[in-house]
Amino acid sequence: MEPPPPLLLLPLALLALLWGGERGAAALPAGCKHDGRARGTGRAAAAAEGKVVCSSLELAQVLPPDTLPNRTVTLILSNNKISELKNGSFSGLSLLERLDLRNNLISRIAPGAFWGLSSLKRLDLTNNRIGCLNADVFRGLTNLVRLNLSGNLFTSLSQGTFDYLGSLRSLEFQTEYLLCDCNILWMHRWVKERNITVRDTRCVYPKSLQAQPVTGVKQELLTCDPPLELPSFYMTPSHRQVVFEGDSLPFQCMASYIDQDMQVLWYQDGRIVETDESQGIFVEKSMIHNCSLIASALTISNIQAGSTGNWGCHVQTKRGNNTRTVDIVVLESSAQYCPPERVVNNKGDFRWPRTLAGITAYLQCTRNTHSSGIYPGSAQDERKAWRRCDRGGFWADDDYSRCQYANDVTRVLYMFNQMPLNLTNAVATARQLLAYTVEAANFSDKMDVIFVAEMIEKFGRFTREEKSKELGDVMVDVASNIMLADERVLWLAQREAKACSRIVQCLQRIATHRLASGAHVYSTYSPNIALEAYVIKAAGFTGMTCSVFQKVAASDRAGLSDYGRRDPDGNLDKQLSFKCNVSSTFSSLALKNTIMEASIQLPSSLLSPKHKREARAADDALYKLQLIAFRNGKLFPATGNSTKLADDGKRRTVVTPVILTKIDGATVDTHHIPVNVTLRRIAHGADAVAAQWDFDLLNGQGGWKSDGCCILYSDENITTIQCGSLGNYAVLMDLTGTELYTPAASLLHPVVYTTAITLLLCLLAVIISYMYHHSLIRISLKSWHMLVNLCFHILLTCVVFVGGITQTRNASVCQAVGIILHYSTLATVLWVGVTARNIYKQVTKKAKRCQDPDEPPAPPRPMLRFYLIGGGIPIIVCGITAAANIKNYGSRPSAPYCWMAWEPSLGAFYGPASFITFVNCMYFLSIFIQLKRHPERKYELKEPTEEQQRLAANENGEINHQDSMSLSLISTSTLENEHSFQSQLLGASLTLLLYVILWMFGAMAVSLYYPLDLVFSFFFGATCLSFSAFMMVHHCINREDVRLAWIMMCCPGRSSYSVQVNVQPPNSSATNGEAPKCTNSSAESSCTNKSASSFKNSSQGCKLTNLQAAAAQYHSNALPVNATPQLDNSLTEHSMDNDIKMHVAPLDVQFRTNVHPSRHHKNRSKGHRASRLTVLREYAYDVPTSVEGSVQNGLPKSRPGSNEGHSRSRRAYLAYRERQYNPPQQDSSDACSTLPKSSRNVEKPVSTSSKKDAPRKPAAADLESQQKSYGLNLAVQNGPVKSNGQEGPLLATDVTGNVRTGLWKHETTV
């Protein structure tokens, strides 16, 4: 075979070369990608721009260089797990320009690791674990332009690290531990010399340089001076360890390595710990990790009881020291426990769990969003309370100081106490504190008083300044308010921090500072404290008499003898005052309309020198005399063991005001100088002792001593004492077995309780009567609701007044009493107004005709609307008042009763109550005028039912005009209310009048003092009795239905027979054209109109059934025998005038004996026929037939009959209502009378009749009927029966016994 020609071998060689190159380029590690992008033309240019990406492949080491293309330009090895770069890791990649090693685990870079990368321009080592770097690491990177070392562990960079990087222009080395100290001073010079840009690199430590650019920090701030701040320093475990004897416990300590002389030492309770195998303690020497951390370990292999204590890791350098500690608690195998316990204090409610002995338990403080920043430890997690359980299993020390106060008052006062004060804001802050201490009576925590005492001391520093003149006045007012606090709270505050003594001493300094500023007289007064100060000369001093008094109204002077008993605290909101003159008698001090609280006589010898040689100097001396009077002894509580003192171990109590006298200035010996003091007692007791208060007794707590004092004179209310030196004077008495008469504990006069109980019993009788006998009492549903609610709210007012008006001792109870009185009073006058409006609507109501009879009637208005007015409006008013400030209710400091503050009561009570009362009076006047204009309107009648309304409309054309003067005959069962409008008006108006008078007399009885309180108590009792009698007579005794209901209940035997009411001798005939009057009786008879002039004879006859004949026979024959007189004409609700269109009550029309209707019965509505036949069938079992329904058979039946008859009549009525659609009846006050929606097929009559139509009876009356005295009598329901142009009056039938008959097709017998 011949060899191939040379020309053919050349193409084959080129193909082999290309195939080999492509093979080499494709031989990459699994997962790596080769990216070649040509920027020019030619295959060589594409290969030179090669890019290899080996990212996120979990590579543990750098790929061998021989696995990568020799012409690789960019190598991406990010997001792997490479931990070390060895020497020559990238040899052979001489064309590599970019190397990305981000997000690996590189902790060590060997010298020469980047050797051979002479073309490398960008190197990224971000987010690795590099702890230290040196110059050999970057050897060979002569062309490197950009280097990023951020996110590593090193704290600093040593000088010379970048010496081999001659082309470097951009550097970034931000880390979390970067320490800007003296070790990076070289970088400032190197950056400036090489013109290098340092990007996004800021200091982290020390804290003073945090967030400042490294190259922007001033060089003088880059120091290595103490204190030492370590970027990283931690000890594990870091929290308290609780272990048992014999356990093993390892510790490890690690810190940032910043200096070569760093050492790590271990300590126990301040003693250095070294390895001791006998005790099982092993200490490892300090070791350096990754050039950035220094670490040491301690192991306690056999823990004993002596291991309990504080163990610490101590880092020591020449730049300073730093320590981390952990507490170890070693328990015995049989350790005890502290039991779980609940602790409630002024910091909150803490529930301590069961805790091992020797352990300190911690609990989070109660969270409170307000004022959290003013407590130590701003973070909520740092605010914890702790409590230690000792080794005996008992709770020991505790600390709640980091927790906020749970009470709002205490928390606000604490905020006041933390406010910085200066001359500018002192007065304003004092005024704010004064406004807050007005409610000092509600202080419940001793810290409240302590904080106020501390604030008064702070204010006292500024009383010397001329700009703070009024500061002293405000301080006295604040101290006066503190005297309103409870004695127990003041006692605890005195024992805890001597708060009361500090307040009194601050008040003494006020006068001293004011007189020192140049003033000759200074005085300030408050309700409980009076302060007076003078600058006096010894020369010419002849003595001084000063009196403390309080002005009172002239009306109160009659009660001076009883004043002390009624008002021990003197909280009349009237200031105490001083009156002084140069005299030793009281003759010139009598002031009109004042109460003398105390007086003091200073003798002329007070300022006299003892020796003659001192006389001349003493005459020219100036003295500062100050007098302070306290209304009571609350600021002088004895807290220590005072058994041997004047109070005899708290057996005696201060019962008089306290008056303080002090002289400042030149040295004066005030001992052995008799001072007479007269004091008014505010309580009665025994074993009186005159005493002085000494601030130095009982280790500075203070106490009363009786040395040098005696009682000169004493009567019921006044005690005069004499003491041998100046000081604080008072009288102490034993109150054991006696009562300190306070307004909170006072009782009302017995006549108030007696008469109030009478009123309560009468109101209960009315309420029970109307609720128990509701179905038997003739009263409308609306009036019933109004009366019951009115009586209930009067009863509520009386009960709360009598039982709670003086309960001022408990603030919450007192507030509740004020709220209930506020509500019940407004509700009472509102229910009177609702009642008056209802009467007015009934008096002026007119019948309204609906425009569209096919439209269904409007639904009835709910009874709830009255409750929304009578009860809802007072609830809203009280709710708004209480929500605005609950302290609007309760006892005022000046009032011994529970009510409201004066200002809020004007808008929340007196204003609304006066307006509602005025509106009520306007309603009463309007009703009175209407009744005078229309005397015929006397009674409220029942609202007609739907059937009655239609029948009334059909009968409207049959009224005889010739007898227009005749009035309707009305049965008493058609009355909606037994009381006439005039009687209802009288009842409502007198109820309101008596209630207002009763309220006023009660208020006077509790607010005035003797003897006026006694007078108004008797007035209150008289009004109570009158009110009781009126309510019983008007609503019970004067009402026949209520009397009968009680008689039937008390005497059940009397209910077996019927009782005739309003029966008069019957009239045999009518006179003057009037129909004979009739009403219901026990026989429940009907009457017909016998007037011949009212009707004409009919020209046609009417077919009568046997039922109708029997009824006609009964009316014509029985009337003269058993007729009852008709009600007075005034019983009609309104006149029948068609022009006035007044609403007509349901009237029972008598059967017309000669009815001549012209009706086509075939045209009667089938629906009506079916309904009426149903009624007929239902009554077939109960109603007598034409034979049995005669008068003779019907009369002997009694009204009660049997329950079976009543049940059958009710079933008949309900059956009729079920088949006949009947819309709900509208409210009588606002509804319009409408016709039923059912079919009304009426055919016009062909003739008229002059006689009366068949009688009509309302469905309601049929339901009430219990006696069937004669045959069935159904009303005509299919249209009016036309008369001959004249209208006859509607006559009343029997209301309780008769079922009417009408004209029926095929009607014979039942």
UniProtKB/Swiss-Prot annotation:
Residue ranges of every copy of the LRRCT domain listed in the record: 176-226
Cytoplasmic side: 769-785, 837-865, 930-985, 1035-1310
This protein's name: Adhesion G protein-coupled receptor A3
Domain LRRNT per the UniProt entry, residue ranges: 28-70
Transmembrane segments: 748-768, 786-806, 816-836, 866-886, 909-929, 986-1006, 1014-1034
Ranges of compositional bias, category Polar residues: 1222-1239
Organism: Mus musculus
Disulfide bonds: 253-313, 709-723
Region feature Disordered, mapped onto this chain: 1065-1084, 1187-1208, 1221-1264
GO cellular component: external side of plasma membrane
Family of this protein: Belongs to the G-protein coupled receptor 2 family. Adhesion G-protein coupled receptor (ADGR) subfamily.
Topology versus the membrane: Multi-pass membrane protein
